[in-house]
Amino acid sequence: MFVVAAGLNHRTAPVAIREQLAFARHGLPPALCRLKEEAGVEGCVILSTCNRTEVYIACNQEEAGLKAAKNFLGRSCKLALADLEGYLYTLNTHHAVRHLFRVAAGLDSMILGEDQVLAQVAEAYQVARETGTTNNVLNTLWQQAIYAGKRVRTETRIDANTVSVSYAAVELARQVFHDELDGRTVLVIGAGKMSTLAARYLKDKGVTTVLVSNRSYDRAVALAATIGGQAVRLDALEDYLPRADIVISCTAASHYILHRDQVARAVAARPGVPLMLIDIAVPRDIEPAAGDLPGVKLYDIDDLQQVVLANLEERKKAARQAEGIIAAEAEAFFQWLGSLYVVPTIVALKEKAEAIKNAEVRRACNRLGQLTTREQKIITSMATTIVNQLLHDAIVNLKAAALTPRGHLYVEALQELFELRVDHTLPGPDMAVSVEGGRKY
């Protein structure tokens, strides 16, 4: 079994391309089902954030898995596959596993060490698990990636003094206005996590008036209440736009929230007063043409790079330590993955032993005549103990040999000596195989 990945991120594609391939939370289940139906796909997870869209596929052949990934991404994008391919990267098993671990640890983020991505990795896995598109290999891989991400944050200072995208947006506004945010009016569009963080950072920086607008007015009211702001209905957005000096927008909408003509009317209503628009949504919330208007400065998520350089050197030192953790956790996963071929033989051996045990217990109980329930349980327990003890050493030694040349010899010997009928499909999600240090996957 192999794991492959394909996708694009902030390093390979600008936001104008990334937004073409972004998946909203509610769109993930049907997308996962479509991907699972691709030829050669045994399991799949889709990770879609503001900085990346990646698909991870468990497959029996790497070439088939990568082909399925590219076909799916091509059909899911508004661009032709030929145009999209220049922005895509494809990763085979070794690179895909290490890449996912680095993503979970925040090492592949635009903001080195940022912590939001770990929650996004966990959510992507949860959605795929609930949709039923994961398998044993992906379950183990994702759980190990999340564990690795937590280890990195616990054992290093990778997230010390780091900044979030929301914080970077506020810092950009502070720089543009030369640290003079006092008395400014800021309109925040959206009431999700990033918008909430932005609103709180704004208050911390001295902004006196924060307007909050959201598709759900109740959520806008709730956020406004926590920061002493004012809630604005989304359909009344244009009425309040002329009051704003800064607009920060981050919604999950699949279409523009602010169009050029709306911004033009707001600017006309306040001649000579500049308007700063910061769009940190993917897909973008603000029509790019709005940035061409006189007096308007429009920034998108890709423009935040200059802000995230703060405190980078300290986090780079932590990143080097984190790479060691990633290497160790990835190697543990590769060992587990490399041992999977022995599992069908172990299952077949246990099943044959269990069948023999059950038959002999029934025969013994019939010969002994009337037995109490307690006596039957004692006989069954004794037979189970004998079987487990007889098989224990063989199974332990087979697992230990799985990563050596002897492993295949042991498998063939057991299958021939015990005349096992082996199902070569992989074990189910609950089958655990321990291969090192007592860690169980």
From Swiss-Prot:
Spell out the molecular function terms from Gene Ontology: glutamyl-tRNA reductase activity; NADP binding
For this chain, the family text in UniProt reads: Belongs to the glutamyl-tRNA reductase family.
Q: Domain notes, please?
A: Possesses an unusual extended V-shaped dimeric structure with each monomer consisting of three distinct domains arranged along a curved 'spinal' alpha-helix. The N-terminal catalytic domain specifically recognizes the glutamate moiety of the substrate. The second domain is the NADPH-binding domain, and the third C-terminal domain is responsible for dimerization.
Catalytic machinery residues: C50 (nucleophile)
Enzyme class per UniProt: oxidoreductase
Q: Which CDD domains match?
A: NAD_bind_Glutamyl_tRNA_reduct
Recite the UniProt keywords alphabetically. Answer: NADP, Oxidoreductase, Porphyrin biosynthesis
Report what the protein is called.
Glutamyl-tRNA reductase
Gene (UniProt): hemA
Q: What is its EC number?
A: 1.2.1.70
Assembly, in brief, is: Homodimer.
* Pathway annotation: Porphyrin-containing compound metabolism; protoporphyrin-IX biosynthesis; 5-aminolevulinate from L-glutamyl-tRNA(Glu): step 1/2
Its biological function? Answer: Catalyzes the NADPH-dependent reduction of glutamyl-tRNA(Glu) to glutamate 1-semialdehyde (GSA).
The UniProt record's further free-text remark is: During catalysis, the active site Cys acts as a nucleophile attacking the alpha-carbonyl group of tRNA-bound glutamate with the formation of a thioester intermediate between enzyme and glutamate, and the concomitant release of tRNA(Glu). The thioester intermediate is finally reduced by direct hydride transfer from NADPH, to form the product GSA.
Site positions (Important for activity):
H99
Which reaction is the catalytic activity of this chain? (S)-4-amino-5-oxopentanoate + tRNA(Glu) + NADP(+) = L-glutamyl-tRNA(Glu) + NADPH + H(+)
* Residues binding substrate: T49, C50, N51, R52, S109, E114, D115, Q116, Q120
Which species is this UniProt entry from? Moorella thermoacetica (strain ATCC 39073 / JCM 9320)
> What is a biological process (GO) this protein takes part in?
protoporphyrinogen IX biosynthetic process from glutamate
PANTHER family of this UniProt entry?
A: GLUTAMYL-TRNA REDUCTASE
Q: Which InterPro entries match?
A: 4pyrrol_synth_GluRdtase, 4pyrrol_synth_GluRdtase_dimer, 4pyrrol_synth_GluRdtase_N, GluRdtase_dimer_dom_sf, GluRdtase_N_sf, NAD(P)-bd_dom_sf, Shikm_DH/Glu-tRNA_Rdtase
Binding locations of NADP(+)? G190, A191, G192, K193, M194, S195
Note the NCBIfam families from the entry: hemA (TIGR01035), PRK00045.1-3 (NF000744)
Organism superkingdom: Bacteria
